[in-house]
């Protein structure tokens, strides 16, 4: 238990320290964008791509945002960062959204952004633990997590908690990095692959990276229906050259160093390793969704 608490504190400190730097460079969405493969990313294009990622995730999970009768009433974003997803959905689709993050600094920033956009009555943000969320059973009809679950070692418990707070029929949506699935003859990844993933995790305070097969198994064990997966790796890699270009520009590097310190610089180093791991067929960007039984 002490190790878990220590890890949670490290994650909170990481985001408390580095959030301001990334917000200044790329805005309130602290996640990858969804691009057409082969696109050349720019800052304006990235702002469109990050909100497209949200729309694509909901579309993938079969969540209707067009039909008022089917539109979600209450969405939870687990690992909400600066609240960008909640703010976007509340503003565009008039959906009530709640975000939870382990970082008090992120909640403060999210609340300030909500106030600036006049959305205080449509969104709310809480500091809390994704493994023990302060919500009632069945409270949300969409439970969504975008690039958060890898900070947690017990991913099955993370998903179980998502399912608990989901209402009957709720969409459970996980967007995350995964490692390659093992072949039928393999018991584990190769030693050099394990070493690569550990280096990536250590740089950005991740606990571990799991396979797509693992996520399907966890959702299956929780009796979710309509489980499906999609490989979106080619849709996110156009962002990497832009990240490197901006981060290693004079303005970008100084901003990262002054506002984010070593924590922010380590993110760029991790993305360099992630880019190579993708090229090597080790790392993927994956969408996984299921539906809680009625």
UniProtKB/Swiss-Prot annotation:
Q: According to its UniProt record, where is this protein mainly located?
A: membrane
The record's catalysed reaction(s) read: picrinine + S-adenosyl-L-methionine = ervincine + S-adenosyl-L-homocysteine + H(+)
Gene3D superfamilies per the UniProt record, alphabetical = Vaccinia Virus protein VP39
Q: Tell me the superkingdom of the source.
A: Eukaryota
**Per the record, GO CC terms?**
plant-type vacuole membrane
- EC assignment: 2.1.1.-
Transmembrane segments in this chain: where?
none
The entry's keywords: Alkaloid metabolism, Membrane, Methyltransferase, S-adenosyl-L-methionine, Transferase, Vacuole
Question: What's the protein here called?
Answer: Picrinine-N-methytransferase TMT2
User: SUPFAM superfamilies, per this entry?
Assistant: S-adenosyl-L-methionine-dependent methyltransferases
């Amino acid at each position: 238990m002490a190790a878990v608490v220590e890890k949670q504190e490290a994650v909170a400190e990481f985001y408390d320290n580095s959030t301001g730097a990334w917000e200044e460079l790329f805005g309130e969405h602290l996640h990858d964008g969804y691009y057409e493969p082969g696109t050349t990313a720019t800052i304006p294009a990235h702002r469109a791509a990050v909100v497209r990622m949200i729309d694509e995730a909901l579309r993938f999970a079969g969540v209707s945002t067009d039909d008022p009768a089917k539109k979600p009433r209450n969405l939870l974003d687990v690992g909400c960062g600066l609240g960008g997803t909640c703010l976007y959905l509340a503003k565009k689709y008039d959906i009530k959204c709640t975000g939870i993050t382990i970082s008090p600094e992120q909640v403060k920033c999210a609340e300030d952004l909500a106030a600036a956009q006049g959305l205080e009555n449509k969104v709310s943000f809480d500091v809390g633990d994704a493994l023990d969320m302060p919500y009632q059973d069945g409270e949300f009809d969409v439970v969504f997590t975008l690039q958060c679950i890898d900070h947690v070692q017990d991913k099955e418990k993370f998903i179980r908690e998502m399912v608990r707070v989901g209402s009957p029929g709720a969409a459970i949506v996980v967007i995350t990095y995964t490692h390659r699935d093992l072949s039928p003859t393999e018991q584990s990844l190769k030693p050099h692959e394990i070493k690569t993933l550990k280096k990536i995790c250590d740089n950005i305070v991740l606990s571990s990276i799991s396979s797509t097969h693992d996520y399907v198994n966890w959702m299956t064990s929780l009796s979710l229906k309509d489980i499906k997966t999609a490989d979106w790796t080619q849709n996110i890699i156009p962002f990497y050259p832009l990240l490197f270009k901006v981060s290693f520009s004079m303005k970008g590097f100084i901003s990262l160093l002054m506002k984010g310190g070593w924590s922010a610089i380590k993110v760029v180093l991790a993305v360099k390793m992630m880019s190579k791991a993708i090229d090597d067929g080790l790392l993927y960007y994956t969408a996984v969704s299921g539906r809680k039984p009625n």
